[in-house]
Amino acid sequence: MTNLPKFSTALLHPRYWLTWLGIGVLWLVVQLPYPVIYRLGCGLGKLALRFMKRRAKIVHRNLELCFPEMSEQERRKMVVKNFESVGMGLMETGMAWFWPDRRIARWTEVIGMEHIRDVQAQKRGILLVGIHFLTLELGARQFGMQEPGIGVYRPNDNPLIDWLQTWGRLRSNKSMLDRKDLKGMIKALKKGEVVWYAPDHDYGPRSSVFVPLFAVEQAATTTGTWMLARMSGACLVPFVPRRKPDGKGYQLIMLPPECSPPLDDAETTAAWMNKVVEKCIMMAPEQYMWLHRRFKTRPEGVPSRY
């Protein structure tokens, strides 16, 4: 497994005091009743919308590209709802790291866990397909409480945040792997482990192919799904951590497994995977991470979409 960050007294250096202050404030806020946290998170998101103009434009542009049939009024409403979800995403990160299991369980409805058990009965590994919802951090904790697995992550540039996010994620999971460690993922899957994996972002031109995603005909999509499924023999199980409306809690939804995905070539698998991604996103489109420049990588010589 990856050499994971550990706490050291170096993290108490004055350069990290501001980060510690932010962590302390987040810890205090998430001790409040959940309905209060919900209102604060949505309010924080609306406030962020006023200042994060560049990100708001990215959200609007992504919606424009993916849903050209959506009216301008509908897009503007979606941008507001998405930023409310951004604010809640920060709160949910604190909840994921600092809440006890019993409190998370109280606000979580689990749907489809039988799909995980069915695959485990076949003695096969599970590639848990996680989409970049803004509930993602909490969703990983919720899933780990049902079935501890192995997370895939990108190390944070701030050593304190890197340690804290690792500590928080390991509260209900077995270990973490660097997202570039394909050999480690394949090894774990062959052992029958559950490995979290997100194929929905733009990871650049290397190891990517251009296939459709929503109304975008050429979306750079990772070939990792093809490599992992082909080399490990794992089943793919998509999961959606969805926030209920009006502060009523969460649904953790596991969709039916796909144990024989199309693996003819990388393009075929990537196009199929994007259809799965679309289905998941449409289960809670306002909660997806539209702030990401999903279509920044373009074929050579083709102008930027942003």
Curated annotation (Swiss-Prot):
Domain of life: Bacteria
Annotated consequence of substituting P238A: Slight decrease in activity
GO cellular component: membrane; plasma membrane
Pathway(s) this gene product operates in, as recorded in its UniProt entry: Glycolipid biosynthesis; KDO(2)-lipid A biosynthesis; KDO(2)-lipid A from CMP-3-deoxy-D-manno-octulosonate and lipid IV(A): step 3/4; Bacterial outer membrane biogenesis; lipopolysaccharide biosynthesis
Main location: membrane
Motif interval(s): HXXXXD motif: 132-137
Compartment(s) where it occurs, according to its Swiss-Prot or TrEMBL record: Cell inner membrane
Membrane topology: Single-pass membrane protein
Catalytic activity: dodecanoyl-[ACP] + alpha-Kdo-(2->4)-alpha-Kdo-(2->6)-lipid IVA (E. coli) = alpha-Kdo-(2->4)-alpha-Kdo-(2->6)-(dodecanoyl)-lipid IVA (E. coli) + holo-[ACP]
Consequence the record notes for mutating E137A: Almost loss of activity
Gene knockout outcome: Inactivation leads to bacterial death at temperatures above 33 degrees Celsius. Phenotype at nonpermissive temperatures includes an arrest of cell division followed by the formation of bulges or filaments.
Keyword field: Acyltransferase, Cell inner membrane, Cell membrane, Lipopolysaccharide biosynthesis, Membrane, Transferase, Transmembrane, Transmembrane helix
Gene Ontology biological process terms from the UniProt entry: Kdo2-lipid A biosynthetic process; lipid A biosynthetic process; lipopolysaccharide biosynthetic process; response to stress
Induction: Is expressed at all temperatures, but accumulation of htrB transcripts slightly declines with raising temperature. Thus, its expression is not induced by heat shock.
Transmembrane segments: 17-37
Known function: Catalyzes the transfer of laurate from lauroyl-[acyl-carrier-protein] (ACP) to Kdo(2)-lipid IV(A) to form Kdo(2)-(lauroyl)-lipid IV(A). Has 10 fold selectivity for lauroyl-ACP over myristoyl-ACP. In vitro, can also catalyze a slow second acylation reaction leading to the formation of Kdo(2)-(dilauroyl)-lipid IV(A).
Quaternary assembly: Monomer.
Protein name: Lipid A biosynthesis lauroyltransferase
Source organism of the structure: Escherichia coli (strain K12)
Organism phylogeny: Bacteria, Pseudomonadati, Pseudomonadota, Gammaproteobacteria, Enterobacterales
Gene (name only): lpxL
